[in-house]
Structure formats: structure tokens, C-alpha cells
């Protein structure tokens, strides 16, 4: 991802921005394929495990961060039920992305 030495470097990093868009697009894909997350994310699981060597705990961490950001952004609309649904979705995605590691 290049220079990640400071918050400013990260915020201005086009590769980070592009990856963020991919992550959010993948969440949309997850919503469309909630009953088949393992298969939907099989290729990404393999990529992150075998090629990128990403610690699978990072998938859980990112999911939790996304839920926090959504709750902050949507405040009143982010009811306990909405929060539970998002937590279930990001946990399912994290599990699917971690599948290749098992």
C-alpha cells in the first residue's frame, strides 16, 4: 500500500482509497449473497491467505470498525436491531474471508 507512516499519509494514499472502495463494494456483494458468503468470498479468502498473508483477525477488526463508523454516521437510524444485523453481516464476511486459513 506504500507509505503508511502517518495518518496524513494514509488518508492521502490512492491505493488505500481504492482498497476501501473494493471493501465497501464487497460488502454490497455480501448483502446480495448472504446465504452463500463462503462461496462468494472463496477467491478473496484464498488471495488474502496464500498471496497477501493477511492476519485473519484483521477481517474481524475491520468489520467492527465499519459497524462503529456506520453507527456514528447514522446515529438515530442505527437502532440496536440495525446494529445487530450489521454485526452479523460483517462477522459472516470475516468468517468467509478466514475460511482458507482453517
UniProtKB/Swiss-Prot annotation:
It comes from the Eukaryota. Signal peptide: none annotated. InterPro entries: Globin, Globin-like_sf, Globin/Proto, Hemoglobin_b, Hemoglobin_oxygen_transport. GO terms for cellular component: blood microparticle; haptoglobin-hemoglobin complex; hemoglobin complex. Residues 1-102 form the Globin domain. GO terms for molecular function: haptoglobin binding; heme binding; hemoglobin alpha binding; metal ion binding; organic acid binding; oxygen binding; oxygen carrier activity; peroxidase activity. Heme b binds at residues 19, 48. Gene3D superfamilies: Globins. GO terms for biological process: hydrogen peroxide catabolic process. Pfam families: Globin. Disulfide bonds: none annotated. Keywords: Heme, Iron, Metal-binding, Oxygen transport, Transport. PANTHER family: HEMOGLOBIN FAMILY MEMBER, HEMOGLOBIN SUBUNIT EPSILON. Belongs to the globin family. Heterotetramer of two alpha chains and two beta chains. This is Hemoglobin subunit beta-Z. It comes from Mesocricetus auratus.
Amino acid at each position: 500500500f506504500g507509505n503508511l507512516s502517518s495518518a496524513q499519509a494514509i488518508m492521502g494514499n490512492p491505493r488505500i482509497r481504492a482498497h476501501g472502495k473494493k471493501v465497501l463494494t464487497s460488502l454490497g456483494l455480501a448483502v446480495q449473497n448472504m446465504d452463500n458468503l463462503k462461496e462468494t468470498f472463496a477467491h478473496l479468502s484464498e488471495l488474502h491467505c496464500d498471496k497477501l498473508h493477511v492476519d485473519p483477525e484483521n477481517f474481524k477488526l475491520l468489520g467492527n470498525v465499519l459497524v462503529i463508523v456506520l453507527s456514528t454516521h447514522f446515529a438515530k437510524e442505527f437502532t440496536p436491531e440495525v446494529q445487530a444485523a450489521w454485526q452479523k453481516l460483517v462477522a459472516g464476511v470475516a468468517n468467509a474471508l478466514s475460511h482458507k486459513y482453517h
